[in-house]
């Protein structure tokens, strides 16, 4: 496995792979890797001849400087995990390598609508930072396939739209959320939880499952479902941030024509902001 830190070396390796006719998969990450990321690598390996994993804590997608500063950097451990899993390349650039002119003068990619709704409304600039860095990685790596986790539901929708709108000839693969045995969605931010909070954390998915059961049973009073869920989370010790039930295909409000709903969960537990989601087939 080759660890690459500069754009020229990355381009050199990509040119070589292209000359050899290799199919390339990209797995974009911010590091602090867990089993969910390893599932992305597995999917990438099954879909291509060469797997490039990027590890870059992207400052452009953080709306708070303190959040950026405390985000875990575990490059050595990450590379050891990736080597064991069979990744071929790790691209681990510095911010200066990715944004040589600084971020204030950086051209950016913005996806209208999806960037500013839901999660984007409470995190200004976050999705613009995501779409910009992913677009840059697409240009540098020139992958045939790129793998993203379904845990970040809105992000995946945004990447799919950006890929289509910008004319990238890249297959976007969404990989199902990996969960701990108690149901908690794996996330790098779970490391912010204390041991006591970690015991409470699976309550997020339990409340989400209850919401899904109500939808499957035909209940359509969304305000009542969300209010009950918010109360249940508060009783467990969470601070509900944003609970939504939307059309799974458009992320707009549910309509009589909606065939699938998505439950989007965001709640604070101590210093950790936990997110989760679940899609539900709707009976007409």
Swiss-Prot record:
EC number, as in UniProt? 6.3.2.1
Pathway(s): Cofactor biosynthesis; (R)-pantothenate biosynthesis; (R)-pantothenate from (R)-pantoate and beta-alanine: step 1/1
Q: Where does beta-alanine bind?
A: 61
What main location does UniProt list?
cytoplasm
Q: Which GO terms describe its cellular component?
A: cytosol
Which residues are ATP-binding?
Answer: 30-37, 149-152, 178, 186-189
Which biological processes are named by the entry's GO terms? pantothenate biosynthetic process
Which molecular function GO terms apply here? ATP binding; pantoate-beta-alanine ligase activity
Active site per database record: 37 (proton donor)
Which InterPro entries does the record match to this protein?
A: Cyt_trans-like, Pantoate_ligase, Pantoate_ligase_C, Rossmann-like_a/b/a_fold
Checking SUPFAM superfamilies in the record gives: Nucleotidylyl transferase
Annotated compartments: Cytoplasm
Q: Which UniProt keywords apply?
A: ATP-binding, Cytoplasm, Ligase, Nucleotide-binding, Pantothenate biosynthesis
- Keyword Nucleotide-binding included in the entry's annotation: yes
Q: Where does (R)-pantoate bind?
A: 61, 155
Under the heading Pfam families, the entry gives:
Pantoate_ligase (PF02569)
Catalysed reaction equations from the record? (R)-pantoate + beta-alanine + ATP = (R)-pantothenate + AMP + diphosphate + H(+)
* Assembly behavior: Homodimer.
HAMAP family (alphabetical): PanC (MF_00158)
Q: What does this protein do?
A: Catalyzes the condensation of pantoate with beta-alanine in an ATP-dependent reaction via a pantoyl-adenylate intermediate.
Which family is it part of? Belongs to the pantothenate synthetase family.
What other facts are recorded? Answer: The reaction proceeds by a bi uni uni bi ping pong mechanism.
What is the protein name given in its UniProt record?
Answer: Pantothenate synthetase
């Amino acid at each position: 496995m080759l660890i690459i830190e500069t754009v020229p070396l990355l381009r050199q390796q990509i040119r070589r792979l292209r000359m050899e006719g290799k199919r390339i998969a990209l797995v974009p990450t911010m590091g602090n890797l867990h089993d969910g990321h390893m599932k992305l690598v597995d999917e990438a390996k099954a879909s291509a001849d060469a797997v490039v994993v990027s590890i870059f804590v992207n400052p452009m997608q953080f709306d708070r400087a303190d959040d950026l500063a405390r985000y875990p950097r575990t490059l050595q451990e990450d590379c050891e995990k990736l080597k064991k899993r069979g990744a071929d390349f790790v691209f681990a650039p510095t911010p200066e390598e990715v944004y040589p002119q600084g971020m204030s003068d950086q051209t950016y990619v913005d996806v209208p609508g999806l960037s500013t709704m839901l999660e984007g409304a409470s995190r200004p600039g976050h999705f613009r930072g995501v779409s910009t860095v992913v677009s840059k990685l697409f240009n540098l790596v020139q992958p045939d396939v790129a793998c993203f986790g379904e845990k970040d539901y809105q992000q995946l929708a945004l990447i799919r739209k950006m890929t289509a709108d910008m004319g990238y000839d890249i297959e976007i693969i969404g990989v199902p959320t990996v969960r701990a045995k108690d149901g908690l969605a794996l996330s790098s931010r779970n490391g912010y939880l204390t041991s006591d909070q970690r015991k409470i954390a699976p309550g997020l998915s339990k409340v989400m499952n209850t919401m899904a059961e109500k939808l499957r049973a035909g209940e359509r009073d969304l305000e009542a479902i969300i209010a009950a869920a918010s109360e249940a989370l508060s009783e467990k010790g969470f601070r509900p941030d944003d609970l939504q039930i939307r059309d799974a295909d458009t992320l707009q409000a549910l309509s009589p024509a909606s065939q699938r709903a998505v439950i989007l969960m965001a709640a604070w537990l101590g210093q950790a902001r936990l997110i989760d989601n679940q899609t539900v087939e709707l009976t007409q």
